[in-house]
Amino acid sequence: VSDVQAGRVAAPKSSSGAAAARASDYFEVFYRSALKLIRLGVAYVDDLSAEEVREYRGTLTEPGRNSPYRDRSVDENLDLFQRMRAGEFADGSKTLRAKIDMTAGNINLRDPALYRVRKVHHQNTGDAWPIYPMYDFAHSLSDALEGITHSLCTLEFEDHRPLYDWCVDKVDLAHDPELWQPLVDAGLPTTPSKPRQIEFSRGNLNYTVMSKRKLITLVSENLVDGWDDPRMPTIAGVRRRGFTAAGIRLFWERVGVSKQNSTIDMSVLEGAVRENLDGEAPRRLAVIDPVKLVITNLDAAHHESLTFPNHPKDESFGRRSVPFSPELWIEREDFAEVPPKGFHRLKPEGEVRLRGVGIVKCDEVIKDANGEITELRCTLDLESRTGMPGADRKVKGTIHWVSARDAVPAVVRLYDRLFDVTDPDDDTDGKTYKDHINPHSRRVVHGYVEPAAAGAAREDRMQFERLGYFVADMHDHTPGAPVFNRVVTLRDSWAKQS
């Protein structure tokens, strides 16, 4: 339910109005429906073992054979089924089967089982039922009871649709209120429908696996951090990653629904989320690989508040105060001692514009005993500040910063694609999907954020300027100890690699 609510749709409700429906709520209705099928002469109790059933069923190229118990009378079948309900028979000794066509080309129609004897404790009904309905029978009737009009499922259920329709048509709940009277008696008003099953292709994405079995393995073997690991293709996972419901809906609008199995590029999903966040996420300043920059021609005690827009394209987001002081944190990659060709950020004796402040020139590079750069000493061109005559002076690069005096230390998790190959399901090279887990899919760094970012509520999304879109972690983030997950980069960083 929480996953569905995260998609900003209504919490699931049955036609009874219950917050969540369970098949076990309908066990009495299923039982009455089975009795009806027996009375109609289209269901019978079979004594064949599971192995014998497989033998009699036939193959894709050979028709099946009728069970020797197929022609039992209605009275005998009613008696046997009621005794099954009473718990007189051992597990697996009898089944209730639909009487359809043992020569049908669709094997699902070769007298499928509707009920079996299974004396197990049920989490909702306890030991009340020694028999349980089979999936196809329970699924179709549950849809009808819940007023479902269209039951959507993936292509592997296409061959099951004729059986789905058979169950719905033969039981005909909509015109037989006596069958669902137990729900009414329990105060659960019900308006059955005649549902239609529609199949579509599974939404496969590259760089991930969608198999439930493989996802369970990833969790059980601690290859990920649980079902809500932001790298997992689960609702809980993409929610914690920070993907928006609107972004996911935009993605599905773009790729559409089809019956053709295909694999969708992960960049399409990320692009839809990125597009949504571009218009919805306020901007904040953060530095995730910090090096200190000291402005030497300002008094060490200098401190002021600058006004920044929360969104460059939407004035309705308002403005905020950003503290500024002579000691700043900037990104380490925004300085190059020996700059490559085309580098337009800070370098020795070079100039760059500090976002919202003015132009600084790097005068001195301070290193530690290991040769690691620890500090950049710069002078600020005071004439280049906002409102001054030189404010429009042009330099090629602009970089962001965070005031060291006011910065809040933050943990930043940089998530990427879980696998390093486009099709981790492909095992033709002798490797399994577990061999292709991307070792760089989760990287944790420690940086600094401006106070407005630190004060975000859990699951608040924002753009860290020049870095990407981030979300305050739904479990670990607090204003005093902020934790952010990267949702997506500002651009498709995989495009150059593929």
For each feature predicted by the language model, list its residue ranges.
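Generic alpha-helical structural element
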Residues: 26, 70, 87, 127, ...
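Active-site cores that bind ATP or allylic diphosphates and position pyrophosphate for catalysis
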Residues: 6-22, 33-215, 282, 287-291, ...
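Short, compositionally biased low-complexity segments
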Residues: 1, 52-58, 134-140, 220, ...
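Long, charged, mostly alpha-helical binding arms that flank functional sites
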Residues: 193-272
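Basic, alpha-helical terminal appendages of large translation-related enzymes
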Residues: 1, 7, 13-21, 25-28, ...
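Short hydrophobic "helix-edge" motifs at membrane interfaces and signal-peptide entry regions
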Residues: 125-127, 232-235, 456
